[in-house]
């Protein structure tokens, strides 16, 4: 069961993870502004959930983030949020982060998006 993770989107996921030996996906920061506004409130709850397992992944923010956007300023905002979540993961000792690329077939041509996704135009380095 070492490859299964339960998402904390379900408020009881940590208890089920403990019962069945699963890992936990910390999903509290899927909404980007929680990194800024609600961290102090969320942090102790996350730490409590982390007592129920020894394996974790942190879900990066994804709402309204487009790391492969056409607009370089939009890409810069996404990169900043990812840098934030990398620091948060380090603070929790989490080494795996789930990141969504923001692909929307109604906005991007697949060939253009794939090229952008794999290019050096998206950087998370500070």
Language model segments and positions:
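Active-site acidic/histidine proton-transfer and metal-coordination neighborhood
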Residues: 71-126
